[in-house]
Curated annotation (Swiss-Prot):
It comes from the Bacteria. Belongs to the ADP/ATP translocase tlc family. This is ADP,ATP carrier protein 3. The gene is tlcC. InterPro entries: ADP_ATP_car_bac_type. It comes from Rickettsia prowazekii (strain Madrid E). The keyword Coiled coil does not apply. NCBIfam families: AAA (TIGR00769). GO terms for cellular component: plasma membrane. GO terms for molecular function: ATP binding; ATP:ADP antiporter activity.
Amino acid sequence: MLPPKIFFEKVKEIIWPIERKELKLFIPMALMMLCILFNFGALRSIKDSLVVPSMGAEIISFLKLWLVLPSCVIFTILYVKLSNKLNFEYIFYSIVGTFLLFFLLFAYIIYPNQDIYHPNDAMINNLIASYPNLKWFIKIGSKWSYALMYIFSELWSAVVINLMFWQFANHIFDTAKAKRFYPVLGMVGNIGLIIAGSVLVFFSSGQYIIDSELLTDSYNSSSNNSIMLQPIISIIVTAGIIAMFLFRIINKFILTNSINVLDVKKVAAKTKTKLALIESIKLIIHSKYIGRIALLIICYGLLINIVEGPWKAKIKELHPNTVDYVNFMGMFNIWMGISCVTFMIIGSNILRRLGWLISALLTPIMLSITGFMFFIFIIFIEEIGTCFGDFNLLYVAIIVGAIQNILSKSSKYSLFDSTKEMAYIPLSLELRTKGKAAVEVIGTKFGKSLGAFIQSLIFIIIPTATFDSIIIYLLVIFIVMMNLWIWNIIKLNKEYIKLCQ
């Protein structure tokens, strides 16, 4: 039996592997990630609560493919050009500031006056009746401001989290520190999801705020409809400003001493070698290693998109109005945050003790098990119902889907993100910076958009199709892509080991 002092040191090493001298850098980085993930959790629920109750869960496939993906491509081109001309710090302020400005404009100007900007329902219904195969595109046009909010909310994840924050972290930490810092950063940051869920539940369940349905219900006044949205957006903007303030503190006061692993002079010399846009794209395409990282992201995005569509359709059946939808998603965020923090504690030890390969494989394994269970439940829901009697099968289906979503995303945030970020570290600064820009933004959205393409193509060809009617085909695609993901991880691990040596 270990002496008490050694035992507690071992426990501390498992739960909190950060040394005291590193707290000066760790604390502001963790708080910055908490603010960014708070916004992610809140925006994720808001974007779904706007589009799903008003246009249907099937519309998500069209939004991801026809709007989100092109927006990501345009942003990547813009980012590569900016990275050749501006300091990373100014790029960060410009991008985050643009997001926050749009959210304010939407909540306080666009949304309250949506009746002025949106076409009337009679005209939309006539267009759908005349062009049934284009009904989903017509629905997007009818609520174009919701679609725009959806795009910006999606880009917050791809741009601010995956690209801006993690690129900054990769510049600061080497591989050894990343193994200790990244899981704990994620653990602290995911508390933001719990806070976001609590905020959403508070503003969607308080009867003193509003007594009836809000946001997307046209028979409510615009002022009442905005009562829930505006304070949430205000908190989101405040969190974004705090994140920028912390970013400034880190750059100005902390990265000037020995804690900064990055050699500033060396970086300045390297970044003088600029590539033209076409050359940058060629560099990314011809890098087999970057291609494998991109495939990781594509597989995850496609698989989670395939599962989320049917799940959100079931949520709409149970919660057809936006208040209940936001309230459910708020509770979902709380449990997601709790699960993520738990997985972060476990994941930090898996990564340090079992290595990169095992840590990277656990996410697809978790997603395959929980995803397969969800599909089987939906496909055989009637047969299952005969065994369990008078249970509310719709509610059970949603809970099964929620468990799948929570567990798979918890393993993704704790292990997938950390192992993916570690895979960038052995690369040169040029390839790491510009390769990551394309992989993170385009790769993230291409995976989801590929799943969206498959689904939207079916919905265009067969306007009467629903997620329930195509669920068996989605299961087949799910199994094929899961095997490809696992094979790619094994191949990437071999190249990662070579680069680290």
